[in-house]
């Protein structure tokens, strides 16, 4: 009986020491905050006006507040605080020269932030390739 009581006591002490050694607060997570200018209704611009990178062909362009865009932004850890900006979903760069081979059957846009491997582009403005 003494052996079992001492084993139980030793086990309780061991668990107490291990619990005391573990940190109580987890390490804080880092959140990426992307700040863009608030979206204003804009007219379609000519492709030559895209100064932020290549013209993009996006499957859809939605508000950053839409469920699909919010989900992707959240999964990527991107926070757009207090603004609703147009974002392009599933985008590929296209060249304006030689449009015949690089046509876009979806929406052509010029976006401010295209650094997410085509999954999402932030701050998009519609582009007219025929201008």
UniProtKB/Swiss-Prot annotation:
Organism field: Pleurotus ostreatus (Oyster mushroom)
Listed name of the protein: Class I hydrophobin POH2
Provide a Gene Ontology MF annotation, just one.
structural constituent of cell wall
Taxonomy of the source species: Eukaryota, Fungi, Dikarya, Basidiomycota, Agaricomycotina
- Provide the free-text tissue specificity comment from this protein's UniProt record: Expressionn is switched off in the fruiting bodies but abundantly expressed in the vegetative mycelium of both monokaryon and dikaryon.
Q: What is its main location?
A: secreted
Q: Which PROSITE patterns match?
A: HYDROPHOBIN
Q: Where in the cell is it found?
A: Secreted; Secreted, Cell wall
Question: Listed disulfide bonds for this chain?
Answer: 50-110, 57-104, 58-91, 111-124
Its Gene Ontology cellular component terms are: extracellular region; fungal-type cell wall
Task: Tell me its family.
Answer: Belongs to the fungal hydrophobin family.
Task: Supply the alphabetized keyword list.
Answer: Cell wall, Disulfide bond, Glycoprotein, Secreted, Signal
**Signal sequence, renumbered to the chain:** 1-21
Positions annotated with a glycan in the UniProt record: 115, 128
Record's function text: Aerial growth, conidiation, and dispersal of filamentous fungi in the environment rely upon a capability of their secreting small amphipathic proteins called hydrophobins (HPBs) with low sequence identity. Class I can self-assemble into an outermost layer of rodlet bundles on aerial cell surfaces, conferring cellular hydrophobicity that supports fungal growth, development and dispersal; whereas Class II form highly ordered films at water-air interfaces through intermolecular interactions but contribute nothing to the rodlet structure.
Q: Which InterPro entries match?
A: Hydrophobin, Hydrophobin_CS
Gene name of the encoded protein: POH2
What assembly does the database describe for this protein?
Self-assembles to form functional amyloid fibrils called rodlets. Self-assembly into fibrillar rodlets occurs spontaneously at hydrophobic:hydrophilic interfaces and the rodlets further associate laterally to form amphipathic monolayers.
């Amino acid at each position: 009986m003494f052996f079992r009581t001492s084993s139980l006591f030793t086990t309780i002490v061991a668990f107490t020491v291990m619990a005391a050694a573990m940190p109580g607060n987890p390490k804080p997570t880092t959140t990426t905050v992307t700040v863009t200018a608030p979206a204003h209704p804009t007219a379609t611009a000519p492709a030559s006006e895209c100064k932020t990178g290549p013209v993009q062909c996006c499957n859809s362009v939605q508000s950053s507040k839409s469920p699909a865009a919010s989900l992707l932004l959240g999964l990527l850890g991107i926070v757009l605080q207090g603004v609703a900006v147009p974002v392009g979903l599933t985008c590929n760069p296209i060249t304006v020269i030689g449009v015949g081979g690089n046509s876009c059957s979806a929406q052509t846009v010029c976006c401010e932030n295209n650094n997410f491997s085509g999954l999402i582009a932030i701050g998009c403005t519609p582009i007219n390739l025929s201008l």
